Amino acid sequence: MQRTRHKGLISLRAIVFSAAAYAGGGPLGIDHQVQFDQSGIWSRHNQVTLESLTFLTIAGGALWEGGESRLGKTYWRAVDSALLATVAATAGKYAVERSRPSQTSDPNQWRQGSGHYSFPSGEVAFISSAITPFVIEYGHDHPWVYALELLPAYDSIVRV
């Protein structure tokens, strides 16, 4: 009896929190408009530079190191991961067809047809997938490697 009531309360909470998340523009109200800013570190140029340097680093590192060393294997995992994430994000864009913030003020515009490919972010997926193999491989030995996780966070903020 006690267990059934506990499960019922969990279900009720899930329904209430789901409704609140939907009403608030996504989970925890995170899907809302923010001020557009292209100055300083938020400029589009910096984001493109980050993506280009990430590509050059993982591709160059993989070719330079080869696949025999620990570092070389990690570079090749990053290349594989980045390619897979790019393909998956592109497929997701065509499946979801979400409008960009510049196209609408409503964050719930999904399945809008051709030209609406805001989500998922291919650039954030690329950066995330490129650093993840390094975090997994070296994070426990060198905790500073976890700081690489700031790159996708930065990239996702700049994308807005």
Question: What would you call each of these model-derived segments?
Answer:
Residues 18-20:
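N-terminal signal peptide c-region/cleavage motif recognized by signal peptidases
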